[in-house]
Amino acid sequence: MKKVVVHLEWPERCFRAEAPELAALRRIAGPSWRIVRTRTENAFLRALRDAECAIVWSFRKEWFAKAPRLRTLATPGAGRELVAWRDAPPGVRVHFGGFHGAIMAESVAAYVLASARGFFRPELASRRPFGKTWPRTALSDKCFTVAGTNAVVVGYGRVGRAIGAKLEALGIAVDGVSRANAGELPRLAAKADWLVLALPSDTGTDRLLDARLISRLPRRARVVNVGRGNAIDEEALLAALASGRIAGAYLDVFRGEPGPLADAGGGTLGAVLSVPRRSLPPNLVVMPHSSAFASQYLELCFKELKNDGCL
């Protein structure tokens, strides 16, 4: 019987393996695998000694020497910041999650639809009942259908393609931008109603969306970032939003955000997180790095590992 050690300890419940997730893993992996869950780093390193597979959020390069039988190192995350994948010895397969593209695509689609239907309009900002200030007339020329609009998805890997497929299902024309056609981005941006960033932080894309690229966008354009915060010049984006240079933005990731996924800025808050939320432009929607939240998150991860031959 082969052994898989599961060390998925994380503050957010959907990212933490508890009894229901472990039961799902046993069902998905089948009887040929023995499942061992660890809660502490020391317990994980002990269990790693005779494990063929490890499912983790983070893995240090020195740990490979403690895992002579390891054949698969898997992490649910798509980002590569927490796993020493470059140091994996020959014979060890490193697997990064791609399943959450479908979840993140729903988050992007939710913003797109809510924006088009006027859900974020300032006319609706009051929490009071409408009363005499019934905003129906004011809202009547602010809504539109998304079918026939144009989206540019930058970062067209598994996550980006899932986002593109979801938007295409809504009737949106999608152009994907990857390393192969990165030079096309300025031209494509000029016709974008939706500019979606789904980039990891290790691809040399720091401040890809800067004042120059923003100036290429139509005034009707909205920016979405569900990749990593390093891809945006936040000062330039805030200025464009405040001036009405672009129509809106949805940011799920930021420069210097708290927690283990903070970028190389040393944890220093970027321009968006440094501003009190009430002072942010009203056409900016911010979320706490939650575009992949789903109660089924880890079960989807385990199914992907099974389908990809890791279990």
Where are the model-predicted features located?
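Phosphate/diphosphate ligand-binding glycine-rich loop within oxidoreductases
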Residues: 49-129
